[in-house]
Amino acid sequence: MKDVVVVVTGLAAMEPLTARRMMVGRTAAETTTTGTWTTVHILASMAARRASMTMTTHLRSRVRRIPTRPPRAPRLSVGGGGGTGTAPPARQASPETATIGTRTIGPSKGRRRRRRRMRRRRRRPVTSSC
């Protein structure tokens, strides 16, 4: 009988020990018995689970440390960056709109509100649970 080679993919490959054990998944009699096969399978699945768990926790611990990217410049202000019109700073609205005197150039109030709400929703970190 030919040698049985088991290909280890994905997370099981992270644990080289079980991978090796899977490669040598045949007995001395050149045959793969169901017993060794199942044990190998169980070991592999356990290894995969452990690896995935450690990975997710690792990533979860990393999430807080990612620096936030600098805010994009609003697409509508008249002057330079956020909220610079020719108005005095006290009269200026949010950085998303450019205020000149009392006249505001930019999206309407409702639109702005909706945008803010969307932005708030987007901030939650997404972590897959295994």
Swiss-Prot record:
Primary localization class, coarse: nucleus
Keyword entries, A-Z: Nucleus
Transmembrane spans: none
Location(s), subcellular: Nucleus, Nucleolus
Stretches with biased composition (Basic residues): 109-130
Region spans: Disordered: 61-130
Highest taxon of source: Eukaryota
GO BP term (any one): negative regulation of ribosomal large subunit export from nucleus
GO cellular component, one term: nucleolus
Miscellaneous comment: MINAS-60 is the product of an alternative open reading frame (alt-ORF) of transcripts coding for the RBM10 (AC P98175) protein. MINAS-60 and RBM10 ORFs are overlapping and are formed by shifting the reading frame.
Subunit record text: Interacts with 60S ribosome assembly factors GTPBP4 and MRTO4.
Its job: Acts as a late-stage inhibitor of pre-60S ribosome assembly by preventing pre-60S ribosome export from nucleus.
The name this protein goes by in its record: Ribosome biogenesis inhibitor MINAS-60
Organism: Homo sapiens
Highest classification ranks of the organism: Eukaryota, Metazoa, Chordata, Craniata, Vertebrata
